[in-house]
């Protein structure tokens, strides 16, 4: 039966090879069988520009290109850790870049896709930070810096982010329910798929269904499968 996959929040890095191994297994065995593959952000733990080169980055790009070459339509939506992924990455992998909110039609279902961080409006400090770093002039300035400097800046931002999370309540870091409902209504859908919060779940709400993709962990890959009958669910080992 025809089907498609949705994943997010892998946070791939050289320090967690077990996550890379899970991704390799998925991309070599499951992904090539799909019609579409949607990666909804935070594929990498951080991204400092398309000009960065490493064995891990090349391996990931090669895997996406391999799946794309099998005829699978691959899509990438920016996360809060890898929002600087650009056109060079897209060309090298065959993955189409999507905007912050993307409306798709899949198996006769209208679906709204987003990474999920834009729905967490109660975290005002993060939203202010997000608005700053998404300014195009600031991104251009950052990308002009030497790679070594960008790495230092990215590591400091990541450390600060991890520190801040310890002081924030779980409620603040989750989606705002009212705002999320407004977005769903704005796009005229009854199905929303997002990641970011790392709280894998399928929320059957009164007027719409909200599917939250989970983060990938040492022994678990959060993979949502949707088939042509319209059925969906997370793949369980």
UniProtKB/Swiss-Prot annotation:
Places the protein is found: Cell inner membrane; Cytoplasm
Acyltransferase is among the record's keywords: no
Domain of life: Bacteria
Record has Manganese as a keyword: yes
Primary localisation category: membrane
List of residues binding substrate: 80-81, 123, 161, 165, 168, 196
Keywords: Cell inner membrane, Cell membrane, Cytoplasm, Hydrolase, Lipid A biosynthesis, Lipid biosynthesis, Lipid metabolism, Manganese, Membrane, Metal-binding
Any one of the GO BP annotations: lipid A biosynthetic process
Effect caused by changing residue 115 to A: 12000-fold decrease in catalytic activity
Pathway assigned in UniProt: Glycolipid biosynthesis; lipid IV(A) biosynthesis; lipid IV(A) from (3R)-3-hydroxytetradecanoyl-[acyl-carrier-protein] and UDP-N-acetyl-alpha-D-glucosamine: step 4/6
Annotated positions binding Mn(2+) 2: 42, 80, 115, 196
Impact reported for residue 81 to A: 7000-fold decrease in catalytic activity
EC number(s) per entry: 3.6.1.54
Pfam short name (any one): Metallophos
Known catalytic reactions: UDP-2-N,3-O-bis[(3R)-3-hydroxytetradecanoyl]-alpha-D-glucosamine + H2O = 2-N,3-O-bis[(3R)-3-hydroxytetradecanoyl]-alpha-D-glucosaminyl 1-phosphate + UMP + 2 H(+)
Details of cofactor binding: Binds 2 Mn(2+) ions per subunit in a binuclear metal center. May bind a third metal with significantly weaker affinity that might facilitate the catalysis but only binds LpxH in the presence of the substrate.
Residues that hold Mn(2+) 1 according to the record: 9, 11, 42, 198
Membrane-related topology note: Peripheral membrane protein
Effect of residue 117 to A: 2-fold decrease in catalytic activity
InterPro entries per UniProt: Calcineurin-like_PHP_ApaH, LpxH-like, Metallo-depent_PP-like, UDP-diacylglucosamine_Hdrlase
HAMAP family, sorted: LpxH (MF_00575)
Family: Belongs to the LpxH family.
Job of this protein: Hydrolyzes the pyrophosphate bond of UDP-2,3-diacylglucosamine to yield 2,3-diacylglucosamine 1-phosphate (lipid X) and UMP by catalyzing the attack of water at the alpha-P atom. Involved in the biosynthesis of lipid A, a phosphorylated glycolipid that anchors the lipopolysaccharide to the outer membrane of the cell.
Name of the molecule in the record: UDP-2,3-diacylglucosamine hydrolase
Gene name, Swiss-Prot/TrEMBL: lpxH
